[in-house]
């Protein structure tokens, strides 16, 4: 799933921000699995 759950680590959180900013233009705390 693309939005599976909340991010637990800073690294994953940062990557999720970059990914979601490019794809959806949103600033949320989800990560890809």
Swiss-Prot record:
Q: How does activity depend on pH?
A: Optimum pH is 8.
One of the record's GO molecular function terms:
serine-type endopeptidase activity
**Subcellular location(s) of the protein:** Secreted
UniProt enzyme class? hydrolase
Q: Which GO terms describe its biological process?
A: blood coagulation; fibrinolysis; proteolysis
Catalytic activities: Preferential cleavage: Lys-|-Xaa > Arg-|-Xaa, higher selectivity than trypsin. Converts fibrin into soluble products
**UniProt KW Secreted keyword:** yes
Instruction: Provide the alphabetized UniProt keywords.
Output: Blood coagulation, Fibrinolysis, Hemostasis, Hydrolase, Protease, Secreted, Serine protease, Zymogen
Q: What is its EC number?
A: 3.4.21.7
Tell me yes or no: is Protease among this UniProt entry's keywords. yes
List, alphabetically, the GO terms of the cellular component aspect: extracellular region
Main location per the UniProt record: secreted
Summarize the temperature dependence annotation. Optimum temperature is 40 degrees Celsius.
Which domain of life does this protein belong to?
Eukaryota
Q: What does this protein do?
A: Plasmin dissolves the fibrin of blood clots and acts as a proteolytic factor in a variety of other processes including embryonic development, tissue remodeling, tumor invasion, and inflammation; in ovulation it weakens the walls of the Graafian follicle. It activates the urokinase-type plasminogen activator, collagenases and several complement zymogens, such as C1, C4 and C5. It cleaves fibrin, fibronectin, thrombospondin, laminin and von Willebrand factor.
Which family does the UniProt entry place this protein in?
Answer: Belongs to the peptidase S1 family. Plasminogen subfamily.
- Miscellaneous notes for this chain? Plasmin is inactivated by alpha-2-antiplasmin immediately after dissociation from the clot.
Please identify the protein, giving its name as recorded: Plasminogen
Task: List the source organism.
Answer: Struthio camelus (Common ostrich)
């Amino acid at each position: 799933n693309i939005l599976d759950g909340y991010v637990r680590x800073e690294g994953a959180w940062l990557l999720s921000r970059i990914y979601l900013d490019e794809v959806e233009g949103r600033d949320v705390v989800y990560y890809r699995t």
